[in-house]
Every structure is written in structure tokens, then in C-alpha cells.
Design a protein with these regions (language model features):
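Single conserved hydrophobic/aromatic residue that forms the stacking wall/gate
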Residues: 1-9
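A short acidic, leucine-rich amphipathic alpha-helix
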Residues: 8-12, 63
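Short alpha-helix boundary/capping motifs
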Residues: 12-13, 54
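Short amphipathic alpha-helical interaction segments
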Residues: 13-24
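Nucleic-acid-binding surface
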Residues: 31, 35-183
């Protein structure tokens, strides 16, 4: 007797029926392919995005908000993906997407928690501020300045790590000029 079930065999069996029967009986609603939510639960936008696009990392304004470095929640989610990933669907959904070379995507990636306590991938403080300085023209000036000042005051910053990221992304001089007067 085999313990391996090909995808098609598994879903031809009654498991699929039982699964959908459970969802129906408990009034779960489809949010996306393979993702269902109970009508009494709060929809956690960022957690759902992380399930739908597991290779994406929350970044830029989304990370700034997570660390408390901007005052208001971003209107649009902000993700970083690897160059070459088709971002058209995400853009249509109102998600702002930045791209990097595939080998840099996971540099500085850590796991954070959404407001609802669900795990999501997000960049660490130093990678976040490096990305902000790299993408300065994308930010409103007051958000940019507030983020830089917040980073400088943050006890958990790691300037050595920041300069490693700055070197990796070829913005070492830009980072140095931005921070030298504040440190």
C-alpha cells in the first residue's frame, strides 16, 4: 500500500469533499486561491499577501510603519520582489512593488508580526533604512526625514550592518552623507 498520493489522486478522493464541506458548514469565505477566512475574523491584508506571495518581503513604507518610523499606516502595501517576477497582478491590486536582484531579496529578511499577530517576512531596521535612502525620491519629504531621525534615535540600529547593506547596493556614500550630520 502506498503512502504517497499524487495531487490528482488526493483531490479525486473524498478529502476534497470533506474539506469543502467543512468550509461551507462553518461559513468560511474564499479570499484567494486556497485561502479562506471565517466571516467573524478580521481580514489581515498583509498576512494574506504573504501567503499568496511567499517570496515577497514587506519593505519601505510598510517596514517603516512596522518599526514606528512613520506616523500613519501606508495606504498601499509595499513589497520587495526579485527582478523578473511578474508584478502586474500586484500592481493591479494596488500593491507598490520594488524589485531587487534575486540574490539580494533575502538579505536582511526577518520575521515580524502583523497587528493581528500573524507572521510576515519584513526587512530588518538597517536594510529598511538603506532601502529608504536608496529610494528617497519615492517618499514624501516629511516621511523621509522622520524615518531617518527615527533610525538615528533607535537603540537597536546596527551601523556596521547598515554600511554592509549600503556597500552591497552601491549607496555607501549616499548613506554616509545622509547620516553623518545626525550621528
Amino acid at each position: 500500500r502506498s503512502t504517497l498520493f499524487p495531487y490528482t489522486t488526493l483531490f479525486r478522493s473524498s478529502i476534497k469533499k470533506e474539506y469543502y464541506q467543512f468550509l461551507k458548514e462553518n461559513r468560511y469565505e474564499k479570499v484567494s486561491n486556497g485561502i479562506y477566512i471565517h466571516p467573524e475574523a478580521f481580514e489581515d491584508r498583509n498576512y494574506i499577501l504573504s501567503l499568496r506571495y511567499p517570496q515577497a518581503v514587506f519593505s519601505h513604507e510598510e517596514a517603516l510603519y512596522y518599526y514606528g518610523w512613520i506616523e500613519r499606516e501606508p495606504i498601499r502595501p509595499t513589497l520587495t520582489m526579485y527582478t523578473g517576477f511578474g508584478v502586474g497582478r500586484l500592481n493591479k491590486e494596488g500593491v507598490k512593488v520594488f524589485t531587487v536582484k534575486k540574490e539580494f531579496l533575502n538579505e536582511g529578511k526577518v520575521m515580524g508580526k502583523t497587528f493581528f499577530g500573524n507572521p510576515i517576512p519584513i526587512y530588518d531596521r538597517d536594510r529598511t533604512i538603506c532601502d529608504v535612502i536608496r529610494s528617497k525620491n519615492w517618499f514624501e519629504i516629511q516621511n523621509y526625514q522622520y524615518a531617518i531621525l527615527s533610525y538615528v534615535k533607535d537603540d537597536n540600529k546596527d551601523l556596521y550592518q547598515l554600511m554592509k547593506y549600503a556597500s552591497m547596493f552601491h549607496v555607501k556614500e549616499k548613506v554616509r552623507q545622509t547620516l553623518e550630520l545626525l550621528l
